[in-house]
A protein has these predicted regions:
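Active-site C-terminal subdomain of aminotransferase-like
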Residues: 33-37, 60, 65-66, 71-87, ...
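PLP-dependent enzyme catalytic core of the Aspartate aminotransferase-like
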Residues: 2-15, 112, 135, 153-154, ...
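Short, flexible, solvent-exposed loop/turn segments with mixed acidic/basic and small polar residues
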Residues: 129-130, 154, 338-351, 415-422
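N-terminal glycine-rich, Lys/His-bearing helix-loop that initiates the first secondary-structure elements
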Residues: 1-81
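Conserved N-terminal alpha-helix of the aminotransferase class I/II PLP-enzyme fold
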Residues: 50-51, 56-122, 147-154
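Conserved PLP-enzyme active-site core in the AAT-like
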Residues: 5-23, 28, 35-42, 113-323, ...
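Residue-level signature of catalytic and energy-coupling elements of molecular machines
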Residues: 188, 377, 429
Length: 451
């Protein structure tokens, strides 16, 4: 885990001077260069960091090896050693590719530190593992990604962690759900898959109000899954959130080649999160960190600018099609939460950036009819479309379509889906870099044949 731009571990003097020199450069430029002259790794003047290919590292002496192990001591209280540069011992403890990536991710989200993991779910699990214990309670928004829902409902009860589900846009319901044992307010925005927007500042204000009456040890934290937006479109830490989690597999990687996850948060969280990762696993391999570092993050801004423009055109087409009952995309004037979206979803140039994912529902009088039509449409696209691929994931350079009710959110029962606002006929569409006319052509073909 890296603590750039700030951190507890003392590195050499280059990062401090570099931070001062780069502060006047655009954030999009810093996605490419990150932290130049990083002390994490002297890679002999390569313009592009090479792929680190070793699982273990040669040590010059037992003394140096001992010092390295002290830095990764067994308790957080012991983990207070200061050094000028990392001592790499073993990939699970630290490795240069992922540490450089962590520096750059912290810059991208404008956070104090970042820790990468094998997947987004590994990052979510680690954050909860660090913040929560037996008897802790989570209050979560009632619609979440299906695997997060599964983690909260199937696994946390085994550890005596209670989860209360509530609509985070209902202020009174949220207040009623909070108890003295609540340690975490957890939500996504935009919400997967419904594209609902949660007011980040209001949730932060609720947490701060309660924390004013609590001791430090009983503090309640806020965490946002920012996967749909990516740091290009939204940076929740700027609104006062404690932690951001993201799946690197999605928009940040962008090419659908590598999995990863990240926690970005305050400086003090460095020690416990890295120690948790050391003991529980979930370390991001160098072979996955490297492509995200050299291809994914540097190209995020240019990819998303184009993909957002295409998403707007596709959303407008669907909104005007007679076969479609509902389209939810923050970039549409008809989107009921657009004022809030415009406040939160701003790119590095302070332009409204509503993302690359939309949600739509085919017309049907009953949930069953809409479900049937959605499955038919998606199945037609799976075999007949050139520009749209039936696949989970999102943020890819290729346009991806999926049916949440039977795929990503199938861990939630049909009855619960309806209660939580997930339409059985809802279709999630993640727009890629194809020409908008080609995507629309394939959608027209599917709508004409099936609906």
């Amino acid at each position: 885990m890296s603590k750039i731009p700030l951190g507890k571990k003392k590195r050499n003097k280059a990062p401090q001077a570099t931070k001062q020199r780069t502060s006047n450069y655009a954030a999009e430029t810093r996605l490419i260069y990150g932290q130049p002259f990083t002390p994490v790794w002297d890679y002999s003047h390569h313009v592009v960091p090479p792929l680190s290919s070793s699982a273990t590292f040669r040590l010059d002496s037992t003394k140096r090896g001992a010092k390295g192990f002290v830095e990764f001591a067994h308790t957080a209280e012991d983990f207070q050693v200061h050094s000028k540069a990392p001592i790499y011992i073993y990939d699970r403890l630290g490795e240069p590719n992922k540490e450089i990536l962590e520096e750059n991710l912290a810059i991208a989200e404008q956070g104090e530190c970042a820790a990468t993991f094998t997947t987004g779910m590994a990052a979510i699990s680690a954050l909860c593992g660090v913040l929560l214990g037996s008897g802790s309670e989570i209050v979560a928004h009632h619609v979440l990604y299906g695997c997060t829902y599964s983690l909260f409902t199937n696994w946390f009860p085994r550890y005596k962690i209670k989860v209360t589900w509530v609509d985070f846009n209902d202020a009174k319901a949220l207040e009623r759900a909070i108890s003295p044992h609540t340690k975490l307010l957890y939500f996504e925005t935009p919400v997967n898959p419904t594209m609902e927007i949660i007011d980040i500042q209001k949730i932060v204000a609720v947490a701060r109000k309660h924390n004013a009456q609590r001791s430090k040890v009983h503090r309640m934290y806020t965490a946002v899954d920012n996967t749909f937006a990516t740091p290009f479109c939204q940076r929740p830490l700027e609104f006062g959130v404690d932690f951001v989690v993201e799946s690197l597999t999605k928009g940040i990687c962008g090419f659908g080649t590598d999995m990863g996850g990240v926690i970005i948060g305050p400086r003090w969280s460095y020690d416990p999160i890295v120690l948790y990762r050391k003991d529980f696993g979930g370390v991001l391999p160098a072979k996955s960190a490297w492509p995200i570092l050299v291809y994914g993050l540097p190209s995020l801004a240019v990819r998303f600018r184009q993909q957002i423009e295409t998403t707007k055109k596709v959303a407008e087409f669907l909104e005007n099609d007679k076969h479609i009952q509902l389209v939810r995309y923050p970039g549409l004037e008809s989107f009921e939460q657009q004022t809030l979206a415009k406040k939160q979803m701003r790119n590095y140039s302070d332009e409204f950036s509503p993302g690359t994912v939309l949600y739509f529902v085919p017309k049907g009088k009953t949930p069953e009819e809409r479900h049937r039509k959605a499955e038919k449409m998606v199945n037609f696209i799976a075999t007949k479309s050139y520009t749209i691929t039936l696949a989970v994931s999102l943020g890819n350079i290729r346009t991806l379509i999926e049916h949440p009710a039977s795929m990503t959110h199938s861990s939630i029962s049909t009855e619960e889906q309806l209660r939580r606002g997930i339409d059985p006929g809802g279709i999630r569409l993640s727009i890629g870099l194809e020409k908008p006319e080609d995507i629309i052509h394939d959608l027209k073909k599917a709508l004409g044949k099936i609906l």
